[in-house]
């Protein structure tokens, strides 16, 4: 093991950054593909914290996180994950707030449309001070300094879809939920770069529309750009969508000063490997794509098993 591998800060100084994306299913432990009871509390030895720490990621995108929800012990899971990962720079964006369901558990509040963003200072934008409202969303964690943050709410699809739900037989007709995206401009050893974390709709077509919206929303941020998340899209479709022509009247793809026009304009899959279901991966919903980076730049691609979630994390390193 080299010094940079033993010390994440040394790895960053050596110009290598370890990225990971992980749909954590609110930290729910799994056994043989079925969810099991979540242990109370979320201390240093909680399953979610252990799983996140095991990835040793410098930049980590997390989906399906709970914040102050009863089902996960009223824990701020983004904060717990950031502490476990040793990532002092982080943001959590609520896809939706929740209230008690008539039959138990939690249900989205349909009237709540405000995007709430929280970070290490314990205050929330869009919600004023931290008001203790339970929610569900995504997070972006970083060991590298962050120059700039950006957050966006993604509206749900207007139609339901039959889905396979962990722990249930057959298909369950489910309505889509609001989603969120986070973007950050990070300070790398070779200069700034942009990371985008997102979780897209499970409704075909609607998730494509969301991905195009995110592409346009981040077009003015500096390259290289790395996009991580559970896209609910398989195969080459995410890359094809990102490389499709810009919408009429909108310039989305721009040249960065330190990259060739071809590299800056073309999005590449950096890893093609199944991530779902975790106990026997067959399809890839979780992706890392980039532009402004060579298509063969990624090293150390892995989907390590963890004790939580029905997804595997996707991990890789890039020279940044």
Located regions from the model:
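Charged, glycine/proline-rich intrinsically disordered loops and linkers
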Residues: 101-125, 162-170, 239-260
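Soluble or luminal CAZymes and related metallo-dependent hydrolases
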Residues: 40-47, 73, 133, 174-179, ...
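Surface-exposed cleft-lining segments at the edges of enzyme active sites
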Residues: 33-37, 65-67, 154-173, 197-204
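Metal-dependent phosphoester-hydrolase catalytic domains
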Residues: 5, 146, 151, 203-208, ...
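Short, solvent-exposed loop/turn segments at secondary-structure junctions
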Residues: 24-27, 66-67, 96-98, 144-147, ...
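Active-site beta-strand/loop signature of hydrolases that rely on acidic residues for catalysis
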Residues: 18-24, 47-74, 141, 183-186, ...
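N-terminal, active-site-proximal structural segment of metallo-dependent hydrolase catalytic domains
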Residues: 1-135, 283
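Active-site catalytic loop in hydrolytic enzyme cores
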Residues: 120-136, 140-189
């Amino acid at each position: 093991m080299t010094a940079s591998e033993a010390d994440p800060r040394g790895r960053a100084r050596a110009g290598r950054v370890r990225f990971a994306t992980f749909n954590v299913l609110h930290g729910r432990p799994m056994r043989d593909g079925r969810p099991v009871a979540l242990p109370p509390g979320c201390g240093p030895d909680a399953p979610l914290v252990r799983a996140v720490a095991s990835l040793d990621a410098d930049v980590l995108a997390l989906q399906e996180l709970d914040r102050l929800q009863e089902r996960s012990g009223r824990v701020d899971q983004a904060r717990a994950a950031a502490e476990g990962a040793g990532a002092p720079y982080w943001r959590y964006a609520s896809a939706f707030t929740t209230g008690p369901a008539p039959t138990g558990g939690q249900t989205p509040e349909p009237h709540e449309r405000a995007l709430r963003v929280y970070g290490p200072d314990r205050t929330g934008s869009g919600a004023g001070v931290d008001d203790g409202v339970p929610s569900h969303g995504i997070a972006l964690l970083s060991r590298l300094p962050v120059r700039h943050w950006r957050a966006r709410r993604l509206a749900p699809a207007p139609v339901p879809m039959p889905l396979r739900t962990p722990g249930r037989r057959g298909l369950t007709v489910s309505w889509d939920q609001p989603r969120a995206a986070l973007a950050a401009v990070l300070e790398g050893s070779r200069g700034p770069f942009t990371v985008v974390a997102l979780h897209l709709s499970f409704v075909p077509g609607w998730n494509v529309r969301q991905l195009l919206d995110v592409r346009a929303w981040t077009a003015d941020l500096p390259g290289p750009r790395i996009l991580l998340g559970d896209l609910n899209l398989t195969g080459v479709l995410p890359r094809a969508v990102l490389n499709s022509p810009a919408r009429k009247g909108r310039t989305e793809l721009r040249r960065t000063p330190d990259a060739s026009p071809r590299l800056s304009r073309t999005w590449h899959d950096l890893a093609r490997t199944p991530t779902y279901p975790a106990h026997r991966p067959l399809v890839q919903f979780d992706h890392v794509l980039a532009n402004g980076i060579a298509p063969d730049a990624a090293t150390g691609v892995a989907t390590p098993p963890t004790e939580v979630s029905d997804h595997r994390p996707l991990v890789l390193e890039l020279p940044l």
